[in-house]
Design a protein with these regions (language model features):
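Short loop/turn segments that flank or connect secondary-structure elements
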Residues: 1-194
């Protein structure tokens, strides 16, 4: 782990390679798992206030569950996460003509109907952020459904943090991303000395 301000960064951010390969996985991270996508409190408000522009892109079962229980529920760690439909898929998922999962929130954003792109936890995936007492732990989430993305990342030689430049900058700012580049350079220089 590398300490940067109030963040503990996994070395995997700099050592692992990753590029989402939706052609291979079909967006499985949006439909598999044991809980919905983590939400920040302000994101709950945004989703609740934006439902009218998001609903036209949602599946009926997603709309039904949100009308019954709301846009989120509390997971086993007592953290807010997106609501799920019966099969475990995120309530905001819809499927395109290739049967790949798509996000109704992101669709509303791409069509100019919403300023909010999607929850930051979704945007940052495969990185997960865990709030600790005095730190945020920033870790690469190893999940077999992303093995094709790791393979593609290796083929294209794209490190996890570089693949995630946009969401990292969205969450922590441009200066933070610049610091990641500096850390990466230091790690590479140390590896050359070995």
């Amino acid at each position: 782990m590398i300490e940067l301000g109030n963040k503990l960064l996994s070395l995997d951010l700099f050592e692992k390679k990753f590029v989402c390969n939706l052609n291979a996985c079909k967006g499985a991270c949006c439909i598999e798992g044991d809980a919905g996508a983590p939400l920040e409190l302000e994101e709950i408000d945004i989703l609740e206030e934006s439902l009218d522009v998001i609903k036209p892109y949602m599946r009926e079962e997603g709309i039904d569950i949100i009308e019954k229980q709301g846009v989120f529920y509390m997971d086993d760690d007592n953290e807010p996460v997106t609501s799920l439909v019966k099969n475990g898929a995120c309530a905001f998922v819809y499927f395109d003509k290739n049967n790949s999962t798509k996000c109704s929130i992101e669709k509303a954003h791409s069509e100019g109907k919403l300023n909010f792109k999607k929850p930051i936890s979704c945007h940052l995936y495969p990185v997960r952020v865990k709030k600790l007492r005095n730190y945020e732990a920033v870790n690469f989430n190893h999940w077999d459904i992303c093995s094709d993305a790791c393979t593609l990342g290796s083929e294209l030689n794209v490190k996890v943090y570089k693949f995630l430049k946009e969401p990292i900058t969205r969450k922590w700012g441009e200066e933070f991303f610049t610091e990641l580049i500096q850390i990466d350079t230091e790690i590479e220089n140390e590896n050359l000395k070995k």
